[in-house]
C-alpha cells in the first residue's frame, strides 16, 4: 500500500513508515521507481538497486 510523503504529505516533509523511500512524486515504496532519481527522503532504503 502506498502512502504520501515528502512535500505532498500532510504535514509536508513526512517520512515513510518502515524506512521506505519517498519518491519525487511523494509516494512511499521500495522499488527503483521510488528510491532512485529525484527521491525525496530515505533514498538508500534499498541498497541493492
Curated annotation (Swiss-Prot):
Binding partners and assembly: Homodimer; disulfide-linked.
Misc. comment: On the 2D-gel its MW is: 10 kDa.
Protein's recorded name: Chitin-binding lectin
Domain Chitin-binding type-1 positions: 2-45
One of the record's GO molecular function terms: chitin binding
Matching InterPro entries: Chitin-bd_1, Chitin-binding_1_CS, Endochitinase-like_sf
Disulfide pairings: 5-22, 16-28, 21-35, 39-43
Pfam families: Chitin_bind_1
The keyword Lipoprotein belongs to this UniProt entry's keyword annotation: no
Record key words, sorted: Chitin-binding, Disulfide bond, Lectin
UniProt keyword Disulfide bond, yes or no: yes
Function: Chitin-binding lectin which is specific for N-acetylglucosamine oligomers.
Coiled-coil ranges (or none): none
Amino acid at each position: 500500500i502506498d502512502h504520501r510523503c515528502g512535500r505532498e504529505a500532510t504535514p509536508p516533509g513526512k517520512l515513510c513508515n518502515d524506512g521506505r523511500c519517498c519518491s519525487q512524486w511523494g509516494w512511499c515504496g521500495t522499488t527503483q521507481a521510488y528510491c532512485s532519481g529525484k527521491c525525496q527522503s530515505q533514498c538508500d532504503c534499498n541498497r541493492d538497486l
